[in-house]
């Protein structure tokens, strides 16, 4: 790691399974007849995990250069139980968590990272970078999309009980826009030339178009137009397809969707 940072490189290390390592640590601890802690894991599990993750970060080298090491650790708790010791201690020492969701994987929604269980504590640190390198509105747009997804989660509890037909049109619109966010923005096709790697500028333009559709649709609903009429010209499906239809090097085409 140190030789990599001295050569002024940015390196990422992926740990395939912290859980298996912790289980091996538990077995060795048992054979050494050490005092077990929660669920049989050794009492020093937390310190071992912290010693590993604390090796990540930016390096100020003696030769005046800079390098960095990023660590991504995979935790596989038994039965998806996030309360077990390995998961809990890992979350103590990291500031970002990607929660993989089995239902999303079965639905072929990749990456199968659930947007409500996942989080990043780096958002505040990165806000100046987004403001200077992408747009001052980037974080605000991101927060608005997350608010819509949270509203969808609350509304889905009602939909499961009594169906979506009984919802008022403004709430139906929220569900429709959330679907656009999930399929048109979050879902990714790694085998598609335009979608396999999307620049930040395009991601921002996609968020802007989705929110533009939301505001214009909400204005029409406030004037009495039902959501069913808005859906007749497949405008929502067209917005879902912009990730494929707009090339990564032709972002000026987004203006066509504002007309």
Feature map (PLM): residue ranges:
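Single conserved hydrophobic/aromatic residue that forms the stacking wall/gate
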Residues: 1-9, 13
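Walker B catalytic acidic pair
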Residues: 17
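Conserved catalytic/coupling modules of large nucleotide/cofactor-utilizing molecular machines
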Residues: 20, 27-259
């Amino acid at each position: 790691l140190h030789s990599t940072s001295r050569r002024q490189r940015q390196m990422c290390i992926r740990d395939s399974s912290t859980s298996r390592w912790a289980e091996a640590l538990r077995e060795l601890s048992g054979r050494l007849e050490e005092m077990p802690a929660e669920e049989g894991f050794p009492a020093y599990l937390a310190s071992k995990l912290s010693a590993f993750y604390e090796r990540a970060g930016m390096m100020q080298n003696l030769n005046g250069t800079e390098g960095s090491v990023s660590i991504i650790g995979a935790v596989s708790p038994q039965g998806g139980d996030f309360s077990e010791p390995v998961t809990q201690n890992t979350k103590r020492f990291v500031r970002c968590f990607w929660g993989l969701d089995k239902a999303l994987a079965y639905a072929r929604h990749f990456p199968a990272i659930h947007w409500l269980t996942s989080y990043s504590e780096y958002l505040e640190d990165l806000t100046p970078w987004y403001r200077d390198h992408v747009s001052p509105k980037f974080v605000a747009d991101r927060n608005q999309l997350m608010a819509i997804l949270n509203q969808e989660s609350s509304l889905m509890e009602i939909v499961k009980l009594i169906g979506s037909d009984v919802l008022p049109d403004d709430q139906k619109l929220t569900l429709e826009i959330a679907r656009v966010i999930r399929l048109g923005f979050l879902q990714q096709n790694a085998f598609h030339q335009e979608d396999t790697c999307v620049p930040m500028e395009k991601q921002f333009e996609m968020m802007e178009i989705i929110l533009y559709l939301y505001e214009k649709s909400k204005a029409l609903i406030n004037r009495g137009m039902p959501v069913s009429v808005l859906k007749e010209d497949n405008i929502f499906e067209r917005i879902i397809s912009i990730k494929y239809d707009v090339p990564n090097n032709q972002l000026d085409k987004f203006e066509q969707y504002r007309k």
